[in-house]
Regions:
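Extended terminal accessory/targeting regions
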Residues: 1-164
Length: 164
């Protein structure tokens, strides 16, 4: 089965001091990856959109709540908060969810690289163990230069991640 989203993102803004970016989900939402793993974002979970520094908001990168990566950012936010899988798995799911939602691969690779390098990192999980993703979906591209698996290996080396 192809990777897909389940449900619609329905949120309420939470009023707070400061950036005022947090939202509460009003209904369940999920992403089912190519391995049929269901990444849940439950009703009442709190999200804050894509963590894009304001200094690089533009037509190319986008803002936290506008862009073809919004739904992927919802399940990624929750995956990072709940830590049911390793950070590497959560970030790979984010990449796959962006592709499933129509994000062009160059942008999805840019966001994946940014989140692997500068996003949250953890190894131990609170729930299921690390999962293996189908490399065919993650590396398929009409542009041969954009090879996800090679990028991931390079990021693993930079981050000192042991590939088991």
């Amino acid at each position: 089965m192809d990777a897909h989203f389940v449900g619609e993102v329905d949120v309420r803004w939470l009023v707070e001091s400061g950036e005022d970016r947090k939202m509460q989900l009003l209904s369940d939402f999920a992403f089912v990856d190519s391995n049929n793993v269901r990444w849940e974002a439950k009703k009442n979970d709190v999200i804050d959109g894509a963590s894009i520094p304001e200094v690089i908001w533009s037509q190319i990168v986008g803002t936290p709540f506008i862009g073809d990566y919004r739904r992927a950012s919802v399940v990624h936010d929750v995956a990072c908060d709940k830590r049911m899988h390793t950070s590497k798995d959560a970030h790979r799911m984010f990449y796959e969810a962006m592709l499933a939602d129509g994000t062009p691969q160059p942008r999805a690779l840019l966001f994946y690289t940014a989140v692997r390098l500068f996003g949250p990192q953890w190894e131990k999980t609170v729930g299921p163990t690390s999962i293996k993703f189908k490399s065919t979906l993650l590396s398929s591209s009409p542009i041969a230069v954009l090879d996800f698996n090679r990028l991931e290996q390079a990021l693993d080396e930079v981050l000192g991640v042991d590939n088991k």
